[in-house]
Structures are given as C-alpha cells and as structure tokens.
C-alpha cells in the first residue's frame, strides 16, 4: 500500500507526554486549515507554516472526525477502516501529531 501522507519537511517524532497514543483522543490543532482536494487534502499549520498532504479521502475522513471520537481507533473504524488495515493510518496520524498538526483532545487551544 502506498503511503497515506506526504510531509515535505522531515517531521520529528513527538516525545514525552505529547507522544502519539492511538488509544487517546486527538483533534486538529486550532491553527490548522484543511483544504479538500480530489486526491485527499492539504493541511496547512498557520503557526509552524508546515504543509502536509493527505493522499486519500479515507485519511481525510479520519482526520476530520478525530474530535468526535474518544480515540483514534474509533475514528478509523467510523471511516470504514478495518482493524487489520489500521497500521498505515496510525503511522500517518503519528507523523501529523509529530508535526503538531494534531494535538491531544485535552490540549489547550
């Protein structure tokens, strides 16, 4: 399977308390804009000036619904991603969290 996300600049993995945990709730950072495209979407973070590409509409559906679910796996299931297919989605979401596109649901806005 091809990757689900393209990040132009190297994204560093989140560390410490901010490390990506798919068993907790996540949401888009308040400074991130989503622009749907035929291939998926563009994400732009106005604070860091980073641009990320979501390579299909399924990952876009997951990202958009994160705030509506108690954890990442629930958001994946709601978007129609089978449990056996979660790995590439979790990886893409981890990269987005590492680049501060996603933040924990309980994080300050």
UniProtKB/Swiss-Prot annotation:
InterPro entries: MftB. Disulfide bonds: none annotated. Coiled coil: none annotated. Interacts with MftA and MftC. Peptide chaperone involved in the biosynthesis of the enzyme cofactor mycofactocin (MFT). Binds MftA and MftC with high affinity, and is essential for MftC activity on MftA, likely via the formation of a ternary complex. Belongs to the peptide chaperone MftB family. This is Peptide chaperone MftB. The gene is mftB.
């Amino acid at each position: 399977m091809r990757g689900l996300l393209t990040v132009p600049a190297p994204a560093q993995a989140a560390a410490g308390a901010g490390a990506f945990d798919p068993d907790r709730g996540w949401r888009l950072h308040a400074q991130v804009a989503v622009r749907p495209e035929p291939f998926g979407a563009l994400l732009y973070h106005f604070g860091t000036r980073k641009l990320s590409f979501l390579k299909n509409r399924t990952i876009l559906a997951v990202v958009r619904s994160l705030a509506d679910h108690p954890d990442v796996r629930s958001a994946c299931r709601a978007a129609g991603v089978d449990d056996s297919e979660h790995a590439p989605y979790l990886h893409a979401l981890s990269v987005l969290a590492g680049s501060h596109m996603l933040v924990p649901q309980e994080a300050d806005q």
